[in-house]
Amino acid sequence: MERFEKFNTSRQEPLRLSIALEEFCREEIPAEHRAVYIGYLRRRLRPALLTLVRQDDTLSLTALTQIVSLPAEALNDAIVLAASEKRTAALVWLLRYKRETFGFADRDFSL
């Protein structure tokens, strides 16, 4: 309960994001708290996605994509971040998600 109060009263976005990412997939929290966390994460999708990539947390990435679909632009940014920071598990997960959701465009090398 105190984490939810800290989430609601804090003005620090990094702290609010951290709490929401830790709490939204826990099963023992009340449904109304989960709804608040999910609403927040939907509004802050790109920072949430990039934070999970930096943490190399594929379980939370899976949980996040079950509540909201990732836009192609945010997904591409996350792929670039995962590759540049050598977050292999997150990179593989993101590439699989991209293949399943958007597919990859075939390049035409004809002359």
Role assignments for model-derived ranges:
Residues 1-111:
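Ankyrin repeat (ANK) tandem alpha-helical domains that serve as protein-protein interaction scaffolds
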